[in-house]
Amino acid sequence: MYCKMKEVLLISKGAELIRVPLCNLVFIQASANYSEIVTVNGKKTLVSFQLGQIEDLIEEQLGESSGDFLRLGRGLIINSSYIFHIDVTRQKLVLSDGDRCWFELSASKEVLGKLKTWIEAEHNSEKK
């Protein structure tokens, strides 16, 4: 998938700069005082930002488009475009593009239940 230049999340700290094309960004998970960025090709990049700081960067840089990225609990930010399967009972969330990436993540029943309800509401509002 081709990404336009403006559709990039810039993460800059000290002498380090990371450019992540948004269409390739599947999820970001907390890892102690760091965050791990996971892209469609399975590449994981550890950055010296806490998840809350990454969340703030997303909101600052993307504005209204930041709604595609959802914070799930304390340890996860997902790109909602990749939501493929939610199983509340098994506490499982699958993020996939239906082709080259497949990630199974765990989340609480409460978080997944809210996510499922939100997606259903979004879907129903789009039909109207």
What are these regions (language model features)?
Residues 2-128:
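Basic, polyanion-interacting recognition surfaces, primarily
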